[in-house]
């Protein structure tokens, strides 16, 4: 993971059970959407390897779970839009939700986290935000 890539995370006080989040997913998806997601996953890895982080805006465009699970998270699209407007390459749902994560350069990570949290706050939803970076050392003895 490139050292310049950071993560703005917002955890809204919205309960999304993994079991329910799985239940909203379709049993089948169109072949075209599946192929598109595979190409985006490949672009995601390539973007990290080549440090071409601007490609993450396309690579993070998911058709397999985000369109369905975002309906479980109030104002999800507004949070994604706020993240991008504040400088994020893109944003997505972390796991089954309700945590949202934006991929952003170090210089903009706090602005993006603040913008994401502000959407929930403005709509009366308590939340916590975090500015994170990847641990590239892996497992180690402390």
Annotate each language-model stretch with its function:
Residues 1-6:
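Acidic/histidine-enriched ion/cofactor-binding microenvironments in catalytic or ligand-binding pockets
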Residues 8-71:
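Active-site rim beta-loop-alpha module in soluble metabolic enzymes
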Residues 48-142:
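Glycine-rich, charge-dense phosphate/pyrophosphate-binding loop(s)
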């Amino acid at each position: 993971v490139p050292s310049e890539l950071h993560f703005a995370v917002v955890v809204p006080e919205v309960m999304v059970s993994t079991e329910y989040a799985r239940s909203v997913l379709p049993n089948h998806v169109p072949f075209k959407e599946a192929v598109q997601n595979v190409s985006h996953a490949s672009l995601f890895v390539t973007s990290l390897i080549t440090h071409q982080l601007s490609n993450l805006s396309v690579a993070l465009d998911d058709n397999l779970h985000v369109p369905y699970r975002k309906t479980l998270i109030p104002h999800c699209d507004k949070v994604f839009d706020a993240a991008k407007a504040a400088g994020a390459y893109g944003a997505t749902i972390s796991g089954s939700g309700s945590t949202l994560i934006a991929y952003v350069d170090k210089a903009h990570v706090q602005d993006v986290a603040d913008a994401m949290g502000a959407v929930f706050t403005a709509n009366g939803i308590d939340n916590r935000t975090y500015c994170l970076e990847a641990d590239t050392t892996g497992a180690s003895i402390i």
